[in-house]
Amino acid sequence: LVGTATKYSECLLAVKFRQVDEDGHVVGGPFNYIEHGMGPKWKWLAKIFAFFGIGVGLLGIGTFTQVNGISSAVNNFFDSNNAWTVSLFGRTYSWTVVISCLILTFCVALVLIGGIQRISKVAQVIVPFMAATYFLAGILIILFNITDVPAAILTIVQSAFGLKAAAGGALGAMVVAMQKGIARGIFSNEAGLGSAPIAAAAARTNEPVRQGLVSMTATFIDTIIICSITGIAIVLTGAYDMGLEGVAVTTKAFQLGLPFPDGVASFILMLCLVFFAFTTILGWDYYSERCLEYLTNGKKKCIKAYRWIYILCVFIGPYMTVSAVWTIADIFNGLMAIPNLIALVALNGVVAKETKDYLDRIKKKEID
């Protein structure tokens, strides 16, 4: 509920305070509503947001976590036992990781540098079908284990609030569990992070409230539906308690819970993750480029150089450990969210006024 309300507020503000740049493009986001909503004296806070927005794109959920997830999913399908390995940077990797890294980096470069948008458009068309496939797979696992669902939900609740911890450390366990939950929630739906408003600002609407309502539904679908199904499926199959991490946990849940051979389940998850992560990588390039444009006043040379750096980070991602990837992502997510959350608190009166005016106009039948 907090995430949904946060997404509503930030996307409403993004549309209200958006601007038109020199090229005639509509741009906006937290940096705009911080500067124009809170006032010019807060421009320093807008710049801090933009700076860390670039950091999240380059080193966080824009590249490292996505590429690491793709390479892990591909490796789980083609070489789960790491039979074909190569030594790089003092560590041993499966050849599938290296090959998938090269292919992904090449595809991202084609879109960002080569301007070949057909790849991204194909991915965007396929993603809804992949989302439906992922959703149905999760539902199947739940249906096949329907009698165990209440126990699984109880386990999730107990784990979420640290209720299984010893009495002496229960409070500390609860704090840690909630911290992890909030961090993963931000990664999942990006509510409060400040990325969604950058996309919402470009929406073709003159009603800030309407865009806020549309944007907040994404948080509900992603967190309440998709993530809940995934979590329940993982607990039902026992995959959460097998010493696995990252994509391997969900892969094992699909293998154990679906009535298909392990290879089929791994293939389904691999395809879903590849398309989800690829479109996310491209999306975060857009977000972080808007942040860079704000900091550099739209200098084209800076944008072109940035794209090469972004591609380099895509190439590096698969060779990092899962723990390192998530630690970096959590740090930058927090640093990016803080300026945005400060702005949301400061501008809550604007959100309330816009919402009231919109509802009054509906009552008067001035709008549909």
Give the positions of each predicted feature.
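Transmembrane alpha-helical segments of multi-pass small-molecule transport proteins
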Residues: 46-51, 78-114, 132-133, 266-271, ...
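Extracellular/periplasmic helix-exit of transmembrane alpha-helices
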Residues: 8-18, 22, 139-155, 163-169, ...
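Transmembrane helix-loop junctions in multi-pass membrane proteins
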Residues: 57-70, 81-83, 108-120, 140-152, ...
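Extracellular loop-to-transmembrane helix junctions
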Residues: 1-24, 45, 222-229, 265, ...
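Transmembrane-helix boundary/entry motifs in multi-pass membrane transporters
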Residues: 1, 11-58, 250-269, 293-302
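Selective recognition of specific alpha-helical transmembrane segments in multi-pass small-molecule
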Residues: 2-10, 101-116, 127-147, 183-184, ...
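Membrane-interface loop-to-helix entry segments
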Residues: 49, 67-74, 95-157, 292, ...
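Membrane-interface alpha-helices at helix entry/exit sites of multi-pass transporters
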Residues: 26-27, 36, 40-48, 82-91, ...
